[in-house]
Design a protein with these regions (language model features):
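Short, aromatic/basic amphipathic alpha-helical patches
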Residues: 61-71
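Intrinsic disorder
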Residues: 27, 55-58, 110-114
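Acidic/histidine-rich, metal-coordinating catalytic segments
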Residues: 45-60, 82-86
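Mobile genetic element proteins and their domesticated derivatives, centered on retroelements
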Residues: 4, 33, 37, 54, ...
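His/Asp/Glu-enriched short active-site or ligand-binding loop at hydrolase and phosphoryl-transfer sites
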Residues: 74-80
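Short interface patches used for recognition in eukaryotic signaling and trafficking proteins
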Residues: 21-22, 76, 105-109
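C-terminal anion-handling pockets and recognition modules
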Residues: 88-159
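Electropositive, glycine- and tryptophan-enriched low-complexity nucleic-acid-binding patches
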Residues: 1-47
Length: 159
């Protein structure tokens, strides 16, 4: 799993997140997200910024919400399963395209340590190749995205 954040005037680096081998399914846990948020968010967000993350259980866990409250982070509330309202979903799609363009061998790579290391390198290369204009354009689409979802009564939109 990877984490990154962007806004109209900023973009973080891409952060690979290792799963917790002690967790039930070995995935990323709220503890990992808490450490990440405590490391990044205080310097990342300015007063008045609204933070948006998807509604994955790891992001909505009580401990994570408590950390966000402690940090004074205002979180955008939005319905689950609403990628139309989350512009980073568009970036993840661009990233996948770019990764396979730069490293086509990854499409059918076995699940090995070497493949994972190559995927991390490819993802960082792809993330670093994103043009600022794409990030600005996606940020600027938020008012239109919200309007489109309202007009579609919560159904699918072009986003």
């Amino acid at each position: 799993m990877f984490w990154a954040a962007f806004g109209e005037q900023m973009c973080t680096g891409l952060v690979p997140l290792d799963g917790d081998p002690e967790s039930r399914r070995g995935g990323v846990t709220g503890d990992i997200i808490n450490i990440l948020y405590q490391s990044f968010l205080p310097d990342l967000l300015q007063p008045g910024d609204i933070f948006m993350h998807d509604n994955a259980p790891v992001h909505t866990a009580g401990a994570v919400q408590a950390t966000l409250d402690e940090l004074g982070v205002e979180v955008m509330i939005w319905p689950p399963h609403s990628p139309d309202l989350n512009p980073i979903e568009n970036l993840w799609a661009l990233m996948k395209q770019k990764i396979y363009q730069l490293y086509p061998e990854l499409e059918h790579a076995p699940n090995t340590t070497a493949s994972k290391e190559l995927l991390i390198k490819a993802a960082k290369d792809a993330w670093n190749s994103l043009e600022d204009r794409i990030l600005v354009r996606l940020s600027e689409t938020m008012p239109n995205r919200v309007r489109a979802v309202i007009e579609a009564d919560g159904w699918y939109t072009k986003y």
